[in-house]
Amino acid sequence: MKRSIIAAAVFSSFFMSAGVFAADVDTGTLTIKGNIAESPCKFEAGGDSVSINMPTVPTSVFEGKAKYSTYDDAVGVTSSMLKISCPKEVAGVKLSLITNDKITGNDKAIASSNDTVGYYLYLGDNSDVLDVSAPFNIESYKTAEGQYAIPFKAKYLKLTDNSVQSGDVLSSLVMRVAQD
């Protein structure tokens, strides 16, 4: 019996000392786990670049208009649709504007080569101005499983409290497709 008590005391002191040293280590472990899924949605070749050709308007159409007013009688629409395909049925497909053509202080305005006139952008026939500062949902433009065709339209936008300047009003936007 005496030997078993001594053996128990030796074993318990051994395990207790191991616990004391376990807290005083100078290294740790970081484990990173990931998963690679199917390719994300992509712009289709030939449908990855579209244009809106705006009608020419005189500077006088902006006289008396406040800053961030649109000229509603000149609406430009895309010549064709921006086309996106997904490898399988996915939910939450969105587009994001990833260029610096946004106007600070107005999440919906798009800058141009003309400091006094820019654009508001719209999706399809929607009359709500597109918030270009955040990803926008394109689910309602689905044409088939995993296929999307997105029409855009634009209106001229006055960007100044003063008179607008004549000249080109160019803007080039880069968009990224993503999914939730």
From Swiss-Prot:
One of its GO terms (cellular component) is pilus. SUPFAM superfamilies: Bacterial adhesins. It holds the Pfam family Fimbrial. This is Uncharacterized fimbrial-like protein YehD. Disulfide bonds: none annotated. Disruption phenotype: Deletion of the operon under classical laboratory conditions does not result in any major effect on E.coli capacity to form biofilms compared with the wild-type strain. InterPro entries: Adhesion_dom_fimbrial, Adhesion_dom_fimbrial_sf, Adhesion_dom_sf, Bact_Fimbrial_Adh_Pro. Gene3D superfamilies: Fimbrial-type adhesion domain (2.60.40.1090). The operon is cryptic under classical laboratory conditions, but is functional when constitutively expressed. Part of the yehABCD fimbrial operon. Could contribute to adhesion to various surfaces in specific environmental niches. Residues 1-22 form the signal peptide. Induction: Expression is negatively regulated by H-NS and subjected to cAMP receptor protein (CRP)-mediated catabolite repression. GO terms for biological process: cell adhesion; cell adhesion involved in single-species biofilm formation. Keywords: Signal. The lineage of its organism: Bacteria, Pseudomonadati, Pseudomonadota, Gammaproteobacteria, Enterobacterales.
